[in-house]
Amino acid sequence: MSGHNKWANIKHRKMAQDAKKSKIFTKLIREIIVAAREGGGNIETNPRLRAAVEKARAENMPKENIERAIKRGTGELEGVDYQEVIYEGYAPGGVAVYIRALTDNKNRTAQELRHLFNKYGGSLAESGSVSWIFERKGVIEIPRDKVKDLEELMMIAIDAGAEDIKDTEDPIQIITTPENLSEVKSKLEEAGYEVEAKVTFIPKNTMKVTGKDAEKVLEFLNALEDMDDVQEVYSNFEMDDKEMEEILSRLEG
């Protein structure tokens, strides 16, 4: 069985491979602008900015684009005033959806989201309706074929402060507190591992969906991700691996 994490990884790979690459850049630039505005333009003293810049570099964003976005955030260059807004709701089948948006027009974003929720048979809910279902965690991912000694990896991660290790799927996931993410990541990189790290929201419980509901959920989540104002979408669905792959293949076809 797989859930939101597998969907997010598949979606990200497809976006990186096709014409939607520019949409990734748009979202990353907004994140850099807001991170620099809130915590300053120095990546050494601003963890959120450092994480955003690392993501941008991983996507091969040109250096000048990154620097320009930082200057827009610090006010050295004129830029759009983005606000961070959280939206919560339910997808088909009762799946909880937690959305983080960066927008210059909250009314427009709320209207577009309400339209999508209604279109796909979900419902936009009040603040606090589903946030309690999710925990904010640091997640480090390492491709299974890059790990020669799983026991060694686990020891390094645990000694550095990791909370949990999920080694049943690919990539292997190491769970940390948001505060310990940077330390665990650094220790793994010092040991020679190539990792991807992020702060995310992990559901405490999941909702299994199948058939039409499963298709509607994935179609709905894809539509949310395609919105320029939406930075991240989190959900607590769970479905069969094969069914997810078949549905995504049809949707992307």
UniProtKB/Swiss-Prot annotation:
GO terms for molecular function: DNA binding. One of its GO terms (cellular component) is cytosol. This is Probable transcriptional regulatory protein Tpet_0454. It comes from Thermotoga petrophila (strain ATCC BAA-488 / DSM 13995 / JCM 10881 / RKU-1). The keyword DNA-binding applies. SUPFAM superfamilies: YebC-like. Keywords: Cytoplasm, DNA-binding, Transcription, Transcription regulation. InterPro entries: Integrase-like_N, TACO1_YebC-like_2nd/3rd_dom, TACO1_YebC_N, Transcrip_reg_TACO1-like, Transcrip_reg_TACO1-like_dom3, YebC-like. Gene3D superfamilies: 1.10.10.200, 3.30.70.980. It comes from the Bacteria. GO terms for biological process: regulation of DNA-templated transcription.
